[in-house]
């Protein structure tokens, strides 16, 4: 009799995706982040579900309901802080995952890469709407400022913003619809993640050398299941240290003040994982130009495969491109720091220079360095 694992229509799919999947024998810990993102997503859906049982999406009671969760619900504070810091872990894993794709040339799997970009946008939208729900000062003003950016779109901008708000300002209608979208989007993300995996399994995984590994494959289980569990334990340890020792480390103190439309906080800023894009937005004096730069800072990932000039796939054997890649990482960290600073003299200039460098590295320097390395190898 055939093993049920290989014959049952449903279990067979799981088997081919997670058990008998042929995987390259040399993939490093950088390939852990896909499974970690899956765990993050499940964790966020579960904690979010329990939070939604106690949350009320009304401007008068939203802030109080979050306080009620933290004070009165059994272990509500753990659930709330796991959800808030879980989002941070989600984005850390996302950035590492995308960085891995950039470094090792995984973007040559075009369908997988493009679904990944779509996933990144969807996760960012979900996180933004989730930040609005506690209805603190930063929630309200963050929602006002970021949604207001759409008014820069010519002709339809103002109508579009009022349509999203459901009125003439961010109010009850906005909060209710944001809660509805925040609840449904993670399930859409789950579906997209399944498609992402489907496309990946059409081609098989890339590996650090960038060389085709069809001749040297090993089963995913037990080798990579054990390896992924190590990464999972490290991530859960970091998450729980954050949750149990300094749950507000990555949050904004202003969000412990209930939303007040009559009082603007001195410095409006989003969560840390959006700061790099926020810095790029602020470094352009023109509103429409800033919005375009903001969108392009992520959309630029879609043209990375078209700008690949090197004869080699990954950067493992390309020291010049490696230097450029780590310069890009340093630049993104600089942008993240600048996004959290007030808009005044040294920070404005640093932000503008870092923004120019960001686009220059991806659009100009990386293709040039790829060509130079091709020439060097000919000698």
Curated annotation (Swiss-Prot):
Location within or outside the cell: Mitochondrion inner membrane
Cofactor(s) listed: heme b
Membrane topology, from the record: Multi-pass membrane protein
CDD domains linked to this entry: cytochrome_b_C, Cytochrome_b_N
Residues given in the record as heme b b566 binding sites: 97, 196
One Pfam match: Cytochrome_B
InterPro entries according to UniProt: Cyt_b/b6_C (IPR005798), Cyt_b/b6_C_sf (IPR036150), Cyt_b/b6_N (IPR005797), Cytb/b6-like_sf (IPR027387), Cytochrome_b (IPR030689), Cytochrome_b_C_euk/bac (IPR048260), Cytochrome_b_N_euk/bac (IPR048259), Di-haem_cyt_TM (IPR016174)
GO MF annotation list: metal ion binding; ubiquinol-cytochrome-c reductase activity
Spans traversing the lipid bilayer: 33-53, 77-98, 113-133, 178-198, 226-246, 288-308, 320-340, 347-367
Matching PROSITE patterns: CYTB_CTER (PS51003), CYTB_NTER (PS51002)
UniProt-annotated binding residues for a ubiquinone: 201
Family indicated by similarity: Belongs to the cytochrome b family.
Summary of subunit composition and partner proteins: The cytochrome bc1 complex contains 11 subunits: 3 respiratory subunits (MT-CYB, CYC1 and UQCRFS1), 2 core proteins (UQCRC1 and UQCRC2) and 6 low-molecular weight proteins (UQCRH/QCR6, UQCRB/QCR7, UQCRQ/QCR8, UQCR10/QCR9, UQCR11/QCR10 and a cleavage product of UQCRFS1). This cytochrome bc1 complex then forms a dimer.
Name of the protein in question: Cytochrome b
Species in which this protein is naturally found: Herpestes edwardsi (Indian gray mongoose)
Highest classification ranks of the organism: Eukaryota, Metazoa, Chordata, Craniata, Vertebrata
């Amino acid at each position: 009799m055939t093993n049920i694992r290989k014959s049952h229509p449903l279990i067979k799919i799981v088997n081919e995706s997670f058990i008998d999947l042929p995987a390259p024998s040399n993939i490093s810990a950088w390939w852990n982040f896909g499974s970690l993102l899956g765990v993050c997503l499940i964790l966020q859906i579960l904690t979010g579900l329990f939070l939604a049982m106690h949350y009320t999406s009304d401007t008068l009671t939203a802030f109080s309901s979050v306080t009620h969760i933290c004070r009165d619900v059994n272990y509500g504070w753990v659930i709330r802080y796991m959800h808030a810091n879980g989002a941070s872990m989600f984005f850390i894993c996302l950035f590492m995952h995308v960085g891995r794709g950039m470094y090792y040339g995984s973007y040559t799997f075009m369908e997988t890469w493009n679904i990944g970009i779509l996933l990144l946008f969807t996760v960012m939208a979900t996180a933004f709407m989730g930040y609005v729900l506690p209805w603190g000062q930063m929630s309200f003003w963050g929602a006002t400022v970021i949604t207001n950016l759409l008014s820069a779109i010519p002709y339809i901008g103002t109508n579009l913003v009022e349509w999203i708000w459901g009125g003439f300002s961010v109010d009850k209608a906005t909060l209710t619809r944001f809660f509805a979208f925040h609840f449904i989007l993670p399930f859409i993300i789950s579906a997209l993640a399944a498609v992402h995996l489907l496309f990946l399994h059409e081609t098989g995984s890339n590996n650090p050398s960038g060389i085709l590994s069809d001749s040297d494959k090993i089963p995913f289980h037990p080798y990579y299941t054990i390896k992924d569990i190590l990464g999972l334990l490290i991530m859960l340890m970091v998450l729980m240290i954050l949750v149990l020792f300094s749950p507000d480390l990555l949050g904004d103190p202003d969000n412990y003040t209930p939303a007040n439309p009559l009082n603007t906080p001195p410095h409006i800023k989003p969560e840390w994982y959006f700061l790099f894009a926020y810095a790029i937005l602020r470094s352009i004096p023109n509103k429409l130009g800033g919005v375009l730069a903001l969108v392009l800072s992520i959309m630029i990932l879609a043209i990375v495969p078209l700008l690949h000039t090197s004869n080699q796939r990954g950067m493992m054997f390309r020291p010049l491109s490696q230097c450029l890649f780590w310069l890009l990482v340093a630049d993104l960290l600089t942008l993240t720091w600048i996004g959290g600073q007030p808009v005044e003299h040294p920070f404005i200039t640093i932000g503008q220079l870092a923004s120019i460098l960001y686009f220059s590295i991806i659009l100009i320097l990386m293709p040039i360095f790829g060509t130079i390395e091709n020439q060097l190898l000919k000698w």
